[in-house]
């Protein structure tokens, strides 16, 4: 086992108010990542069917693996509907507020949930009913059951109503049931689930810092329908934020596996690299705004890099500032993590690709430049300059396609009532 002990201590060091906002942002990356990926995939294939199928395989491959991880971290036991609900409340596919989910608990074998606001729906509705059907029917049907599979293979998630919306302003946006019937044939693992589960990344152990008495240390209690991240203790919330990063890296690995099947290894990695670059910039913009770092500079770049979701779990992050220079060192907790053939963003970093690191810096301060990157037995080292005299870099073309997404523009309500603090 690889122990995830040092690489994200920046979460544990944040003031609680900042930690809550950063954890929300980290969860939200689960929706930003497909806003970065799918345009690049469409340009590579000119096929919406390919987009739908890669999305299906991406989420089906990764979600059972990361659901199991979150269940262990949060002490979620059992194979009931409430256990499924708790895991969904901690799934980056259901980021809080952006996907404003209401829950009606019935018993251990059934519940209903509905979306008062679905940012993903509002993203695709301008493109017409066919794209809405692709997301809300073609993709949702298999991926929902795959997520529930991690808790109970006989669970089924089925719609009471869902988009395309009739009438066009129908609320809630959709309404679903979760039911467990012993007579159901068990759902089996998706074709890539075992491959994702066997990755070195998936085997990292997420250890918490010393607990303080400022919130829940797990979710072994009854379901709280209006669960919020602010109900968790600081150490638990920091661990959950690390787990959100893990979810997103496992999704990137699963996405690469799905891409390779359709476009081959070389093109798959090229598509993934563009996703990494786009996400680096956009997620940094949001983190910088959340942390009040509008003025940029080397210290601001360093602060965001310590927290950014595109950098791999399982690595210690040593970020140092000297004048207008930032040095980022990523040291793997186990040598098997530094694998150039590892699928996903981890493999990009392990091969010495620097695009995501550079754009993550530029999303904080467009004057930032990646001056050098090196991969050695001890890890990855990047040198970044943030010179006051430098010209502002242009936003990557891959990131421009995210500009109008509701996920990119979404602003969280950080009032105490909405955060649960």
Where are these regions (language model features)?
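N-terminal accessory segment detector
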Residues: 1-112, 119-145, 149-175, 181-421
């Amino acid at each position: 086992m690889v122990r995830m002990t040092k690489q994200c201590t920046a979460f544990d060091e944040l003031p609680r108010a900042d930690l809550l906002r950063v954890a929300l942002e980290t969860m939200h990356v689960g929706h930003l990542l497909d806003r970065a990926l799918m345009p690049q995939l469409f340009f590579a294939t000119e096929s919406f069917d390919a987009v739908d199928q890669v999305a299906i395989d991406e989420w089906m491959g990764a979600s059972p693996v990361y659901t199991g991880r979150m269940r262990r971290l949060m002490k979620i036991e059992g194979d009931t509907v409430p256990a499924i609900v708790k895991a969904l409340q901690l799934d980056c596919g259901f980021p809080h507020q952006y996907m404003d989910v209401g829950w009606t608990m019935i018993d251990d074998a059934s519940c209903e949930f509905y979306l008062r606001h679905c940012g993903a729906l509002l993203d695709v509705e301008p493109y017409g009913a066919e794209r809405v059907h692709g997301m809300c029917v073609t993709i949702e049907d298999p991926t929902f059951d795959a997520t529930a599979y991690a808790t109970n293979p006989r669970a089924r998630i089925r719609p009471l109503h869902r988009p395309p919306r009739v009438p066009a302003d129908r609320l809630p946006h959709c309404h679903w049931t979760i039911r467990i019937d012993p007579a159901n044939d068990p759902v089996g693992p998706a074709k890539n689930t075992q491959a994702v589960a066997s990755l070195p990344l998936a085997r990292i152990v997420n250890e918490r810092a010393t607990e303080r008495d400022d919130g829940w240390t797990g979710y072994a209690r009854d379901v709280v329908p209006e669960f919020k991240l602010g109900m968790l203790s600081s150490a638990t919330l920091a661990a959950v934020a690390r787990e959100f990063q893990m979810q997103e890296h496992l999704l990137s690995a699963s996405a690469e596996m799905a891409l390779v099947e359709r476009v081959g290894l070389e093109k798959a990695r090229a598509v993934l690299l563009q996703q990494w670059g786009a996400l680096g910039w956009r997620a940094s913009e949001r983190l910088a705004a959340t942390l009040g770092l509008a003025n940029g500079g080397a210290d601001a770049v360093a602060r965001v890099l310590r927290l950014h979701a595109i950098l791999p779990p399982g690595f210690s992050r040593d970020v140092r500032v000297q004048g207008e220079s930032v040095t980022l060192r990523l040291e793997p907790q186990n040598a098997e993590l530094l694998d150039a053939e590892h699928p996903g963003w981890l493999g990009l970093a392990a091969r010495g690709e620097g695009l995501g690191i550079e754009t993550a810096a530029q999303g904080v301060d467009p004057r930032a430049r990646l001056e050098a990157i090196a991969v050695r037995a001890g890890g990855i080292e990047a040198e970044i300059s943030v010179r006051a005299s430098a010209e502002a870099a242009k936003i990557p073309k891959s990131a421009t396609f995210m500009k109008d997404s509701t996920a990119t523009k979404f602003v969280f309500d950080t009032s105490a009532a909405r955060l649960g603090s």
